[in-house]
Swiss-Prot record:
Keywords: Glycoprotein, Golgi apparatus, GPI-anchor biosynthesis, Hydrolase, Membrane, Signal, Transmembrane, Transmembrane helix. InterPro entries: Per1-like (IPR007217). The keyword Transmembrane helix applies. Belongs to the PGAP3 family. This is GPI-specific phospholipase A2-like PGAP3. Residues 20-97, 153-165, 216-220, 276-278 are lumenal. The lineage of its organism: Eukaryota, Metazoa, Chordata, Craniata, Vertebrata. The chain crosses the membrane at residues 98-118, 132-152, 166-186, 195-215, 221-241, 255-275, 279-299. GO terms for cellular component: endoplasmic reticulum membrane; Golgi membrane.
Amino acid sequence: MFLAAAAFLLSAPASASQGDKEPVYRDCVKHCVRANCTGARLRGFQSTQPPYMALTGWTCRDDCRYQCMWTTVGLYQAEGYSIPQFHGKWPFARFLCFEEPASALASLLNGLACLLMLLRYRSAVPCQSPMYHTITAFSLVSLNAWFWSTVFHTRDTYLTEKMDYFCASAVILYSIYLCCVRTLGLRRPAISSMVGVLLILAFTSHVSYLTFVSFDYGYNMAANASIGIINLLWWLCWCWLNRRILPYWWRCGMVVLLLHGLALLELLDFPPLFWVLDAHAVWHLSTVPVHFLFYSFLIDDSLHLLNTEKPGVKLD
């Protein structure tokens, strides 16, 4: 429902942080680039760089920034100061080409869980079920978002950051459409069609503003959070109204409450344990099991709709 979406509502990286503002860090980067990233030294770096690093776009300057980050962290620790952030992020120990190994792994696990449960849904629910195609499309949108989340946590670039944020917004907006179809659209298809058009226009405007006007992290977070709250209240209202009719309603309510409760983990925002596991990674990891509960609800609900879709029978 909101699995891919909820994982992005609170995070809003800054363009500059305490660590990368430090003169020692900036001087280190300048010296490293001058000494290693020109002429024969640059060719030497490129010839010895592992293929997986080159394929993921790691440059000599990027490597200088990485090495100087740890030099600065070491100085902070030696003086007894708290660990600073660099370019809006905590310092992470790189593993192979993965900038944030734990978050990348967690995003991959979420994607695999989503794929596994989509396949289970398609094998358990006939395509004649009223929600079949809407749920399948939502799952594909979610899979795309988890793919780009994995890519972004593997390698943070201008493109991967934008795709991560835009695809997360797509999931949030599509989750509104999914909610609308399930609660209103089955009896009044015109309403869901109208809402679908409005959501497409909203997504187009949102992406256009962030791309061509200003990539405003605060605006992006506020917009996504607002839609997420609407989604939360809409689903909880539906669950409450159907609690005596649908025996599986609690699964939907549990998923909604779990996701928004688990999102509070992001507020902890501590330096990564062992330079790998931070609050964001813990948050991502905690959402993996929720896919199974969510799709259990979707399967039961889709089968219920299939069995009650008869002339004169009201769809809940």
